[in-house]
């Protein structure tokens, strides 16, 4: 009888241990499956959220542009052009009043169509270069 009790408890213990191990594996598999489904759902949600943010960003930019057009119908840069048809700046001032750019080199070109210099004078009077 004692040996029967021992064998019965041994079988019962081993059976319960194996059952608990099987249940743990099932739970792990179910958790993995749920995590996989959850990841897919979260990816879909992320995609929708990103798309919504993108649409909202575009709409806000369009709203800003329409406000700018309301207050600046020609744009900030074109406001200058509205009052100053010629671009206003240091370089453009020279072009506005002096059609030929002013500078040491350009002054020579303005009054002397042929460049003046030691080498160019030789070419002017002597077509064949003369060297020393």
Swiss-Prot record:
The modification Isoleucine amide is found at residues 102, 116, 130. The keyword Thylakoid does not apply. Residues 1-22 form the signal peptide. Residues 30-42 have a biased composition (Acidic residues). InterPro entries: Frog_antimicrobial_propeptide. It comes from the Eukaryota. The modification Leucine amide is found at residue 62. Its main location: secreted. Expressed by the skin glands. Keywords: Amidation, Amphibian defense peptide, Secreted, Signal. Belongs to the frog skin active peptide (FSAP) family. Brevinin subfamily. Fallaxidin-1.1 shows no antibacterial activity against Gram-positive or Gram-negative bacteria. Does not inhibit the formation of NO by neuronal nitric oxide synthase. Has no effect on splenocyte proliferation or smooth muscle contraction. Fallaxidin-1.2 shows no antibacterial activity against Gram-positive or Gram-negative bacteria. Does not inhibit the formation of NO by neuronal nitric oxide synthase. Has no effect on splenocyte proliferation or smooth muscle contraction. This is Preprofallaxidin-7. It comes from Litoria fallax (Eastern dwarf tree frog).
